[in-house]
């Protein structure tokens, strides 16, 4: 059965940006309520929100014929860290959207849901797909709203990203041995567009990372015991992860 493209758990990929990790941004757990996994600027991210995404992650892994990692294992901890990161970043974006004068209307979300239903053959079929993936219509709508809002904010944050001809030339000189082996990038002239996009993506990520870090400091992020991504992820990320949905 086809999967409705919805939510990015491992990383939030927007406009060619790999969103900044929040894993070093937290502080102590003394101010987090018992029914929350973290707070962002005083707003709680609830255990229910976390469990909803964990349920989705487990359903996706199971649907692929893979056994979900055991609780406490390094791979399991990476899932927890990634989900908490996603929820924290979504809250940071939501709290910052007003600064940029951007918002996402219920109509925009409903229009996207309608487009998905049309693509997959109607509401009943979409609901069946969502159930298979451990999701609900409410989660689908929330994920659409989060993604649309993040795209709008990201567009503002990275608007000034730029790449110079000098940077392109320097990149070519550093990677010519590899690029020249492929027909479409065999010369600087042919590779220029590819190099420009690569460098532009890097420039966007740099701006996004700096902005996220600054907003984290301004808002303040606190994690409940056992949910601090920096403490959960003490080893390199495993190869297996929840597939980002585009």
Q: Where does each model-flagged region fall?
A:
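Short, low-structural-confidence N-terminal segments
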Residues: 1-75, 190-246
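FKBP-type peptidyl-prolyl cis-trans isomerases
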Residues: 2-10, 21-34, 39-40, 65, ...
């Amino acid at each position: 059965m086809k999967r409705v493209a919805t939510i990015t758990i491992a990383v939030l990929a927007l406009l060619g940006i790999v969103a900044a990790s929040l894993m070093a941004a937290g502080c102590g757990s003394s101010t987090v309520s018992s029914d929350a996994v973290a707070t962002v600027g005083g707003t709680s991210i609830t255990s229910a929100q976390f469990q909803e995404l964990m349920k989705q992650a487990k359903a996706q892994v199971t649907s692929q014929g893979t056994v979900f990692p055991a609780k406490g294992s390094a791979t399991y901890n990476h899932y927890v860290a990634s989900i908490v990161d996603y929820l924290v970043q979504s809250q940071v974006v939501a709290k910052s959207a007003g600064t940029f004068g951007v918002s996402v209307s219920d109509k925009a979300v409903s229009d996207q849901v309608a487009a998905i239903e049309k693509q997959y053959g109607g509401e009943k079929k979409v609901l069946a797909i969502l159930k298979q993936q451990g999701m609900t219509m409410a989660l689908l709508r929330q994920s659409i709203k989060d993604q649309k809002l993040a795209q709008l904010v990201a567009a503002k944050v990275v608007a000034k990203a730029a790449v110079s001809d000098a940077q392109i030339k320097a990149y070519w000189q550093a990677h010519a041995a590899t690029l020249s082996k492929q027909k479409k990038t065999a010369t600087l002239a042919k590779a220029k567009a590819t190099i420009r996009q690569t460098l532009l993506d890097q420039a966007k990520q740099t701006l996004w990372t700096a902005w996220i870090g600054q907003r984290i400091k301004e808002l303040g992020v606190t994690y409940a015991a056992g949910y601090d991504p920096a403490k959960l992820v003490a080893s390199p990320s495993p190869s297996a992860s929840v597939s980002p949905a585009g």
